[in-house]
């Protein structure tokens, strides 16, 4: 692809969520969503293969449907109230339609079916954008209108997402699908706490991005799209695979790593709001997620098959210089931030 075209595309992807976050006008929020949607489509279909074309088509159809629902809500709301923002007096049906359409954009269960398939059909670096930056705009809209959300629907979306994210990742061998189901589970945690303490949603999103970025960097460094590829890469880049194991445990929420912080804070806040059943179910599903992360670490580091690969261990000096600095820094942040919990939560 032409470098100038790539610059324009990435700039549009960057500006879309920024416009959405900085707007209180529903129409401008919708414009920001559409900018990021239309800009990422060429990246999804850039690799000329049936799988990438299928991924781009599925992504476009799902996101376009959600965008049409959002635009319909905006028009009907303006017709009823004469305002370009949602109010307490807004029709409940319109609020529920907005919530469901944003759930489709985020990949929350039961509207999650497109996310693993799309992530599986695209390159790792585009998958990183899809699972991190593209989540910011819909979440920012939910954050602005969190007081208007229906708690029942929000709870159903949250608990179903946590269940799907935990169970869906159990039988996967493709690393991109594992990260997709991880994203679904984390979005469920963010949605669960949104009606009660939206600031914890922002904290969870920040830590989720902080954990997902180094995980994808390690996968890209080894070109690892399957668990078997990761296990074969152990004799070449043992330090990177060690960091991968630590990041996976942090993603699973194992104390005392950073990933434990948002789960701890969210469960505490849910208990304060008398949501003991919800918090118990989510804690059980968190253990299930931790199990398949641990199983992934076991399969890629402790079950190495005999190999005739005589290639020498790759020194960190011969790897990408950017990764030499970024990856250790992000790994430290993704493992040792728990002592700052009191400052982060307050």
Swiss-Prot record:
Predominant subcellular localization, coarse grouping: mitochondrion
Mode of membrane association: Multi-pass membrane protein
Highest taxon of source: Eukaryota
Record-linked InterPro entries: Complex_I_Subunit_2, NADH_DH_su2_C, NADH_UbQ_OxRdtase_chain2, ND/Mrp_TM
Sections of the chain in a coiled coil: none
Compartments where found: Mitochondrion inner membrane
Segments passing through the bilayer: 25-45, 56-76, 94-114, 122-142, 148-168, 178-198, 200-220, 240-260, 278-298, 325-345
Pfam families (UniProt xref): NADH_dehy_S2_C, Proton_antipo_M
GO BP of this protein: mitochondrial electron transport, NADH to ubiquinone; mitochondrial respiratory chain complex I assembly; reactive oxygen species metabolic process; response to hypoxia
EC identifiers of the protein: 7.1.1.2
Reactions listed under catalytic activity: a ubiquinone + NADH + 5 H(+)(in) = a ubiquinol + NAD(+) + 4 H(+)(out)
A GO term for molecular function: ionotropic glutamate receptor binding
Any one annotated GO CC term: mitochondrial inner membrane
Keywords of this entry: Electron transport, Membrane, Mitochondrion, Mitochondrion inner membrane, NAD, Respiratory chain, Translocase, Transmembrane, Transmembrane helix, Transport, Ubiquinone
Similarity comment: Belongs to the complex I subunit 2 family.
Biological function: Core subunit of the mitochondrial membrane respiratory chain NADH dehydrogenase (Complex I) which catalyzes electron transfer from NADH through the respiratory chain, using ubiquinone as an electron acceptor. Essential for the catalytic activity and assembly of complex I.
Quaternary assembly: Core subunit of respiratory chain NADH dehydrogenase (Complex I) which is composed of 45 different subunits. Interacts with TMEM242.
Protein name: NADH-ubiquinone oxidoreductase chain 2
Annotated source species: Rattus norvegicus (Rat)
